[in-house]
Amino acid sequence: MRIAVVTQKIVRHDGQGRVNAVVVEEFLRRGHEVVAIATEVADELARHPSLRWMPVDGGGVPTQLARDQLFAWRASRALARARRAGIDRVVVNGFVSWARSDVNAVHFVHSAWMRSPTHPVRKSLSPLSLYRALYTLLNVGFERWSFRRAGRLVAVSRTVAEELRRDGIDPARLAVIDNGVDVAEFQPGKPDPTLFGLPPGRPVALFVGDARSDRKNLDGVLRALAEVPDLSLAVVGDKRGGPFPALARSLGVEERVRFLGHRRDVAALMQAADLFVFPTRYEPFGLVLLEAAASGLPVVTTRLAGASWLLEDGAAVVLDDPDAQDALVAAMRRLAADPEERRRMGEAGRRIAERHDWPVTAGRYVDLLEAMGPLASGVGLSGTLVRSTS
């Protein structure tokens, strides 16, 4: 088959981009051709003889909302050109195009985020919070429109599937394909605080995620750290313009915290840490949770992370409420003090991760496409619109 994949990034150093990259690799491994309609494609994929990259630039405009719209418009035009040349299947990721698709892989549900009690607009009516609310609400409409124009929807977790059902999506159109992990790249290692620029003598908790907003609850982690003096913290993620370095200073923990910014060596950093803390307030999946488990790290997270249910069998402390500060402090204190429990949980996490290696996950995407009828997207091979039978 000739498969068009429409998404912004097909790279390994980005959460959603990593999913796209491993799925595209599996398409190519099974002998399919791929047309990648994207802003960025990993070099090794762009050089593959069976992949054609149609670059789409979504930049040059001042806001993310405008960039998303520009990308969708340009991607739709590129897809129309690709269809004229012959396309058998179209795979998109959420709202990235105005065109129809065979499969829409859903990594985030804006309606669920809008309903969340931790959405920024419920805490503040500042201009930034109001812009984020507008961005979310508009994306609710764009996503629902895009979902209606897809033959099948793939939810990347049970959490996402439930959110889609709540929004009225017919369960018969839904498939759940949990994200996976590269167990060869993410492997257990030996803790080394000096890799983070931290002195020896204390275990290191690692946090990986956006360090500019409070959705992933870095503020809660820093406040908990202030009550666990025998623990250090390394933070990986873009912190530009974020409030958390100042919060660390105000809490008096800045000497035990290192803000490392965006890094591409996350696997090496996980090997050097002692535990992973990610008490998110909303996360449709959370690739970093499986990556931490594969690295042999005990995990502290919440039920609001889509991947949390995978780790409940002895690999994680799963909190019911991300804002239950006493419970977060207790979990961090317990793991900081007990290396034997860290070891047991890390071994359990590694066993779980090995059952979710990326080739298995990516293969399920290919199986789904290969099993679909030829007109699943409502678009014939020539690009002529027909009535969908899904």
Predicted segment positions?
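A short, well-ordered alpha-helix in the C-terminal region of glycosyltransferases
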Residues: 203, 341-355
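Short hydrophobic beta-strand element within catalytic cores of glycosyltransferases
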Residues: 298-301
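Acceptor-binding helix/loop patch of EC 2.4 sugar-transfer enzymes
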Residues: 101-144, 184
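A short, active-site helix/loop in glycosyltransferases that binds the activated sugar's phosphate group
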Residues: 144-176, 181-185
